[in-house]
Structures are given as C-alpha cells and as structure tokens.
A protein has these predicted regions:
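Predominantly the structural core of cysteine protease catalytic domains
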Residues: 1-87, 92-120
Length: 120
C-alpha cells in the first residue's frame, strides 16, 4: 500500500467495558465501537444521549474521549456518571458538530463490540 494507507493489525473485543475502553484511550488509542443504532441516536441534535431505545440498525463510530459527570443530579445524568464521547461519520449536522456524549444507560444498551487497530 502507498501513503496515506497503511497496513494495520486489529483485535476485537466482543464485550468491551467502559473501563477497558478508557484504558485504551489513556494509551493513546482510538477504539472503533460497534453499536446498535436507536431512533434517539439517529436524530441526535446536540446534547447527551442518555436513554436506550429500540435498535433499528448497526453502525460504527470512534471513541474519542470519556468524562465523569460532576454537575447536579439531572435525573437522566447523575453525579459520577461516566459519559463516553464519540465521533460519528455522518457530518457536522449530527449531534454536536459530529460528536456526542453517551450516558451509561444508553452506552450499556447500545454498544456490542469494539476493535482496536494497531500499526504493523
């Protein structure tokens, strides 16, 4: 292959945990996440996706960050909740400029696989 393409190896985790994915982020990796798309995900316009929903399809996104929520209890997001930040490929009109925060209930319901690409 010639630049900008490169060969890569990959490992698949069929049951990724938030902690294992955060360790990958801390090691400067960007995990690819397989998730079940819900109507809330499809139509996300800013904000945080907090509630699971009926799956309508599958999709892959990049996990680019994680944060622990420290604000007041909002009912759908509580202090201490771990929010996962993803980057989608659907352009800047989706989510918040192409990114979204996913709350723990939605994350646990939607995510079913991760893959980690590593250079050869």
């Amino acid at each position: 292959l010639s630049a900008p393409f490169h060969y890569a190896d990959f490992t698949v985790d069929p049951a990724p945990t938030r902690d294992s994915l955060i360790r990958q982020l801390n090691d400067d990796h960007v995990p690819v996440i397989g998730l079940r798309v819900t109507p809330g995900f499809m139509n996300l316009n800013g904000g945080i996706l907090t509630e699971p929903g009926p799956p309508t399809d599958g999709h892959a996104v990049l996990l680019v960050g994680a944060a622990r929520y420290t604000g007041p209890d909002l009912g759908v997001v509580e202090p201490g909740d771990q929010l996962m930040c993803i980057q989608n490929s659907w352009g800047t009109s989706w989510g918040a400029n192409g990114y979204a925060l996913i709350g723990p209930r939605a994350w646990d319901d939607m995510v079913f696989v991760s893959a980690l690409l590593t250079p050869r």
